[in-house]
From Swiss-Prot:
Residues binding heme: H52
Cellular component annotations (GO), alphabetically ordered: extracellular region
Cofactor(s) the protein needs: heme b; Ca(2+)
Record's subcellular location: Secreted
Organism: Ginkgo biloba (Ginkgo)
Protein name per UniProt: Peroxidase
One of the record's GO molecular function terms: heme binding
Amino acid sequence: LSPTFYATSXPNVXXTRDSVVEIGQLADTVAPVRGFDVIDNIKDMVALSGSHTIGQARQATRSPAQVDLSNTRGLLGQAGNDFALVDDK
């Protein structure tokens, strides 16, 4: 996976391209499995990371993810520049 855009301009952005890939994959795999309100929170995280929409992130990450769901919250927190935007429902 190699997205053709970069979410930048926010503070403490590290490995942003990989993070956006993880965000897109987690949005597809975690939302139906864990019942998180993922899409709205992902939209906020991507916007905070550089004004990219979840649609762009998901277009760049069409492949299914191999995600360890036990670390889902940690991955989303890291990808969102440590914003705690994902809450259990």
